[in-house]
Amino acid sequence: MLVAERQQKIVEIVNMRSSIRVSELSDIFSVTEETIRRDLEKLEKEHKLSRSHGGAVSIQQKESEIHFSEREITNVIEKKAIAHEAAKYVKSGDRIILDASTTAWYMAKILPDIELTVITNSMKAAIELSNKENISVISTGGILLEKSLSFAGPLAERSLETYHVNKTFLSCKGFDVHNGMSDSNEWQALLKKRMIERSDQTILMADSSKWGNREFSHIASLQDVSRLITDSGLDPASVKALEDKKVKVTAVPLSKRG
């Protein structure tokens, strides 16, 4: 990796994390701590970050990550209905990926205790699945994003290169026919792209409120999706537009269950 590229990545990491220690950056980039200190000194002079005792802090206010506790209470009925439908596509012996969405967490909660291998970047999903003795759980590791209680970044992306799975179950912040799937967080988008690449099938779990939204970071085309599971709030014209593009759509009816 070129010096300029490493320094750009350092800025991205610091902005994502708000703060980080020199030792962590040294591990991420496999260079000495002295090299990282020189990088931070240069970046501070360029007004791209601020050095602190033992590390660096962001000079930006970044709000692309919504706190998990807030997402957990948003569109709960829709997300639970979608999660229940998605769980039907999992069978014993599968190797699957779950992203760090609240819908994937709801899915983790209801997955039967059968022979499965689950790779996830979600702390919540990993903890939930750890209670099921027949399910093997692999965490991607990486940089912890405190608001979403998930891992992302270069280490998380590299960890996926080791694996191949049958199915990936993920969500997004926005999707439409022309622009595909998108996310407000660049690192989450990059990791989801890697998840799709490592999987035979990708099942998108997205409630109807996300239809038509176009967020900052592109994930992938809807042509990369094997099936979209959404809720019955998605209007028939939109369903037809998706099906015209050869996207298989399952729109689950909504009940009063919470």
Swiss-Prot record:
SUPFAM superfamilies: NagB/RpiA/CoA transferase-like, Winged helix' DNA-binding domain. The gene is yulB. Pfam families: DeoRC (PF00455), HTH_DeoR (PF08220). Residues 3-58 form the HTH deoR-type domain. It comes from the Bacteria. Residues 20-39 bind DNA. GO terms for molecular function: cis-regulatory region sequence-specific DNA binding; ligand-modulated transcription factor activity. It comes from Bacillus subtilis (strain 168). One of its GO terms (biological process) is regulation of DNA-templated transcription. This is Uncharacterized HTH-type transcriptional regulator YulB. Keywords: DNA-binding, Repressor, Transcription, Transcription regulation. InterPro entries: Carb_Metab_HTH_regulators, DeoR-like_C, DeoR_HTH, NagB/RpiA_transferase-like, Tscrpt_reg_HTH_DeoR_CS, WH-like_DNA-bd_sf, WH_DNA-bd_sf.
